[in-house]
């Protein structure tokens, strides 16, 4: 079998970027690798290396990127591709992740979050491409990761019956509360996947990354992902302002949107509890454990909504809090 280094060199040899200087970029929780290629004139592009043999597929990224760009949004332009072997050359949108810009210039925080909220308003008014639904059953099963991975990692034993009961009840809640016309949800819309592009105008000032897992879902999902960030504390005032800003700009039913926001908060944050536990236990990435207390706080806050009453006590009783002792049990 030809190794990936050889495959990559063959891919680059068929592009104008073959002789450009290469440097590794920080990766993410996936199996993808990224490099920045720098030309003799200082121009740069980004190489994505997504091994198909590790379950990666660049085709959804290409399809969604092209769609987002047709809507006037700043997804990277695809400069060259080899979908069979999992290589892409992308427009380089720079290094100014929202998280870095806010750390450097805290006064910009509200402006950046408002711009990211406006992206969602614009996207949710656009005609939607064909996407698989992010429906109640799938969402309930993904939430179950908190029981199968987070709970089991701490307690040392699983309870399939408990998980099955929860998923059945939660599916009913999702079906009753997460309703309406679906929109494209990127599913990982947060400050480390957004880039600030101040030289552009309007919604194009927000560079978009990591949208390849997009599905058809509820408009509240990406807004909640943005404002209940697993990696940084978003001020409560900004969260409340952006929810109100979205509701007013999108001209939608406020009560139903806020209910869906809370239910989806529990859904997503339960999934993240399980994913972070799995990344530590199964993949030797213990740094994700340090993020769990923040995710737990989002989850517990969401449980206070009356719509979650059918599962709230079950979850409070069965999911152990992330005490220092419990977190240590999740580390390899």
Give the predicted meaning of each segment:
Residues 61, 109, 113-116, 139, ...:
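Hydrophobic packing residues in well-ordered alpha-helices of helical domains and bundles
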Residues 1-18:
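Juxta-kinase regulatory segment immediately upstream of eukaryotic protein kinase catalytic domains
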Residues 31-38, 47, 171-221, 233:
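Active-site acidic catalytic loop and adjacent metal/ATP-binding pocket
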Residues 274-332:
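ATP/Mg2+ or Mg2+-diphosphate-binding catalytic cores
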Residues 258-260:
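Hydrophobic, secondary-structure "cap" segments at the distal end of domains
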Residues 4, 8, 128-138, 142-185, ...:
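An alpha-helical support segment within catalytic cores of ATP-dependent transferases
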Residues 26, 32-137, 145, 151-156, ...:
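ATP-binding pocket architecture of kinase catalytic cores
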Residues 145-154, 216-253, 266-283, 295-303:
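Active-site activation/catalytic loop segments of kinase-like enzymes and analogous catalytic loops
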């Amino acid at each position: 079998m030809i190794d990936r280094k050889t495959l990559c060199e063959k891919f680059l040899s068929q592009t104008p970027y073959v002789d450009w200087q290469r440097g590794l970029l920080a990766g993410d929780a996936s199996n993808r690798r990224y490099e920045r290629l720098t030309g003799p004139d200082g121009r740069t592009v980004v190489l994505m290396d997504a091994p198909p043999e590790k379950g990666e597929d660049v085709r959804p990224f290409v399809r969604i990127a092209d769609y987002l760009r047709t809507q006037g949004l700043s997804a990277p332009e695809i400069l060259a591709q080899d979908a069979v072997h999992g290589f892409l050359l992308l427009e380089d949108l720079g290094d100014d992740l929202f998280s870095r810009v806010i750390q450097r210039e805290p006064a910009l925080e509200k402006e950046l979050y408002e711009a990211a909220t406006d992206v969602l308003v614009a996207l949710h008014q656009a005609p939607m491409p064909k996407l698989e639904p992010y429906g109640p059953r799938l969402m309930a099963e993904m939430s179950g990761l908190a029981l199968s991975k987070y709970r089991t990692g701490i307690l040392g034993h699983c309870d399939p019956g408990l998980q099955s009961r929860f998923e059945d009840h939660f599916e009913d809640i999702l079906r009753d509360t997460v309703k309406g016309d679906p929109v494209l949800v990127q599913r990982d819309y947060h400050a480390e996947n957004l880039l600030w592009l101040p030289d552009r105008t309007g919604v194009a000032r927000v560079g978009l990354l990591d949208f390849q897992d997009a599905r058809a879902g509820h408009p509240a999902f990406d807004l909640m992902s943005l404002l209940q960030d697993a990696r940084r504390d978003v001020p409560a005032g900004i969260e409340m302002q952006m929810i109100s800003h979205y509701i007013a700009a999108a001209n939608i039913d406020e009560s139903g949107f806020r209910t869906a926001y809370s239910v989806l908060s529990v859904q997503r944050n339960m999934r993240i509890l399980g994913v972070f536990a799995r990344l530590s236990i199964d993949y030797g990435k213990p740094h994700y454990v340090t993020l769990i207390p923040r995710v737990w706080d989002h989850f517990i806050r969401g449980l206070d909504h009356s719509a979650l009453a059918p599962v709230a006590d079950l979850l409070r009783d069965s999911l152990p809090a992330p005490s220092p002792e419990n977190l240590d049990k999740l580390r390899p």
